[in-house]
Amino acid sequence: MSTTLRELNGFSAEPASLTASTLVLIDYQNTYTTGVMELEGWAPALDAAADLLARARAAGTPVIHVINDGGPGTPYDIRAEIGQIHPRVAPRDGEAVVVKTAPNSFVDTTLGELVDAAGNYALIIAGFMTHMCVTFTAEGAFLRGNSATVIADACATRPLRVLDTDVSAPRLHASALATIADLYAVVVPTIAALAD
């Protein structure tokens, strides 16, 4: 097995702890549970995200929700039910909601300011889709100097086709997590790996 870039740079392999982190939940929107953008494995991933959110709330972890706005009439229309956050992980009063338009949740949003205001260097990241907004937000966190942990089973994606090759959702999910784990963040299989 290859040596990761994290190992070469001497970065910690220790997952984040809930009490010393901020939780960033990305794009758990209804659009990923039905219709043209439905993801494979969204239901168990959403269950894992709900468990993660409940545990974070119990630990007093700051929570930031991120949603993508594709504009009126799109599958990401946050003014319509399709673009809203799924009820299983809906924000509570006092939990920030960041609206983004790019895969990197830090681009042209207040996420960085909210993360800094929460006062935690470490982030815990989970969301939809693994290969897109989760990957690029983990990269964004890394580039701004945060230490991130990504929860694999709370993420999901969809199958794609490229260069006459079908890429299954599990393969794409695993490939995205490998990219993240090579440099941008610690990747853990489940929330069981997180200390309180």
Residue ranges and their predicted role:
Residues 29-34:
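Short acidic, Gly/Ser-rich segments with clustered Asp/Glu that frequently serve as metal-coordination loops
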Residues 68-69, 128:
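Short, well-ordered beta-to-alpha junction loops that form the rim of enzyme active sites
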Residues 1-22, 51-54, 74-196:
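Active-site-adjacent betaalpha module
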Residues 37-65:
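A short alpha/beta connector and helix-capping loop motif
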